Amino acid sequence: MAISKEKKNEIIAQYARHEGDTGSVEVQVAVLTWEINHLNSHIKEHKKDHATYRGLMKKIGHRRNLLAYLRRTDVNRYRELIQSLGLRR
């Protein structure tokens, strides 16, 4: 199941840097984190769903690249985001 419009808007409102912000690194990472957590729970139930597992790995790689970019450009924003999302880094 894809992320619902309401849930996505809720995440965007929480992590947006300004009004109408949908593309900042923080918003993208927050949405990806929600999707990754959702797919992770699906994989635990359906262990042989290899197509979903591949999609999960792609999303994890995308999030990793975005976090690396944020760490290079602004360490303080990176640390705040990691802490608010509860990611291990």
UniProtKB/Swiss-Prot annotation:
InterPro entries: Ribosomal_uS15, Ribosomal_uS15_bac-type, uS15_NS1_RNA-bd_sf. SMART domains: Ribosomal_S15. CDD domains: Ribosomal_S15p_S13e. It holds the Pfam family Ribosomal_S15. GO terms for cellular component: cytosolic small ribosomal subunit. GO terms for molecular function: rRNA binding; structural constituent of ribosome. Disulfide bonds: none annotated. One of its GO terms (biological process) is translation. SUPFAM superfamilies: S15/NS1 RNA-binding domain. Gene3D superfamilies: 6.10.250.3130, S15/NS1, RNA-binding (1.10.287.10). Keywords: Ribonucleoprotein, Ribosomal protein, RNA-binding, rRNA-binding. PANTHER family: RIBOSOMAL PROTEIN S15, BACTERIAL AND ORGANELLAR, SMALL RIBOSOMAL SUBUNIT PROTEIN US15M. Part of the 30S ribosomal subunit. Forms a bridge to the 50S subunit in the 70S ribosome, contacting the 23S rRNA. Belongs to the universal ribosomal protein uS15 family. One of the primary rRNA binding proteins, it binds directly to 16S rRNA where it helps nucleate assembly of the platform of the 30S subunit by binding and bridging several RNA helices of the 16S rRNA. Forms an intersubunit bridge (bridge B4) with the 23S rRNA of the 50S subunit in the ribosome. This is Small ribosomal subunit protein uS15. It comes from Streptococcus pyogenes serotype M5 (strain Manfredo). The gene is rpsO.
